[in-house]
Amino acid sequence: MAKRIIYNEQARRALERGIDILAESVAVTLGPKGRNVVLEKKFGAPQIINDGVTIAKEIELEDHIENTGVALIRQAASKTNDAAGDGTTTATVLAHAMVKAGLRNVAAGANAITLKKGIDKATEFLVGKIQENSKPISDSNAIAQCGTIAAGNDDEVGQMIANAMDKVGKEGVISLEEGKSMTTELEVTEGMRFDKGYISPYFATDTERMEAVLDEPYILLTDKKIALVQDLVPVLEQIAKTGKPLVIIAEDIEKEALATLVVNRLRGVLNVAAVKAPGFGDRRKAMLEDMAVLTNGQLITEDAGLKLENATLDMLGTGRRITINKETTTIVAEGNEQAVKARCDQIKKQMDETDSSYDKEKLQERLAKLAGGVAVIKVGAATETEMKDKKLRLEDAINATKAAVEEGIVPGGGTTLAHLSPILKEWADKNLEGEELIGANIVEASLTAPLMRIAENAGSNGAVIAENVKSKPFNDGFNAATGEYVDMSSAGIVDPAKVTRSGLQNAASIAGMVLTTECIVADLPEKKDAATPGGAPGMGGDFDY
């Protein structure tokens, strides 16, 4: 296909137009008084959401060049989401501000490479300062505050996540389910999560989130490689009659058997998903046995004289729900408290008997996985549209609290970045010069962008608010919900340091890439069909733009 090539300023301005469109669509959701965005769906009701990365994923522009700008800034949001699980809107607003300020300097003749060096040095300095000012989370009250802010100022959600973490521990698994009632409820049940995802993405039942969610599945556990589909046929036929889904957890599934499972899944013959067993050697077998106890099934292993081709339904485990993504598998089981407790006692006994610190550590990991259980939050709402929005907010809140436990918390509401602005200026004036200093000044000028946008969404003058906040002590900021200047930590307005750090690093990375762009190669727009009905005479062969 023929390509369109654009150079220099024209290329950067085309990227900027795309970035402007995406940033504005996402920025309206920022802060406690941020608005919602409605996403049209080809099938079903429209989705009303307040989540930056979900909005960013939906935006596709007609102009290929502008769409490249959208894709670049979308990356800042999705990388922040991958790293910290929240802060995607902040990352987008920051990247947009840096790109705008940077392009003005490049247009005025500044060297883009040296500017990027300055941006990178300023970011490195700021990351150190964020870590310096972060406070470790000390109690469940701080966890609740973090969850509340990430869920869009919903106290109930924050408190529920704090309760869930109390029950399953800070490293515990918190899972989301669609509830049957109007209220959101918390329940703790047996379950575990391990670090292996589906073998093939074709097993995903939710293609938007790339997840496989199977309710009340049978679970086939085996420590052997499945090479031939013939080994599986007897058990697959039995399951097909029940109409229930199946999850296979095995050492590996080779191409022929995997292809057959995928074809059956895509044709709707059998709802199936396959996962590689976690661990290696004896540890893998022990973890599979743990899963067998948890799911009330048997591990099909030749050591016990069991063969796959002879497997029956009563050898299979069962669960309430299994959620599999590309990296992890979460099993929610129920009703096996006694068996799980006995297995935990057995692991504790092994820990007492072993002298190896490595073995002890691995046994402790297994014990934590088995004994910790899973906290299930059942999301309640009046309509399906509200339920989807609530689930996204809850997901952000869970991720934010986990990030806060990892790296501590800093004052929220854009306050930390705004206060770091004069500190960065002072450091840059002493340590940088020339165009590197200009690069650092670009970052410095952008640091107040999230706070300004939060204030503007609340109906205040962003520039005035930002200047006022900069003149106050580090912990003081603007509470957009009440319109007052308060001590952010005391008011419970806090952000995880990891979220603030990731957002800043990803924004600076994308801004640097855009500024150093000198040429864009994109597909030419396709010609419209000459015989398009209803067009004006002579307009048939026109381009899309």
UniProtKB/Swiss-Prot annotation:
Forms a cylinder of 14 subunits composed of two heptameric rings stacked back-to-back. Interacts with the co-chaperonin GroES. SUPFAM superfamilies: GroEL apical domain-like, GroEL equatorial domain-like. Its EC number is 5.6.1.7. CDD domains: GroEL. GO terms for cellular component: cytoplasm. GO terms for biological process: protein refolding. The lineage of its organism: Bacteria, Bacillati, Cyanobacteriota, Cyanophyceae, Synechococcales. This is Chaperonin GroEL 2. It is found in: Cytoplasm. One of its GO terms (molecular function) is unfolded protein binding. ATP binds at residues 29-32, 86-90, 413, 479-481, 495. It comes from the Bacteria. It catalyses: ATP + H2O + a folded polypeptide = ADP + phosphate + an unfolded polypeptide. Belongs to the chaperonin (HSP60) family. Keywords: ATP-binding, Chaperone, Cytoplasm, Isomerase, Nucleotide-binding. The keyword Isomerase applies. Together with its co-chaperonin GroES, plays an essential role in assisting protein folding. The GroEL-GroES system forms a nano-cage that allows encapsulation of the non-native substrate proteins and provides a physical environment optimized to promote and accelerate protein folding.
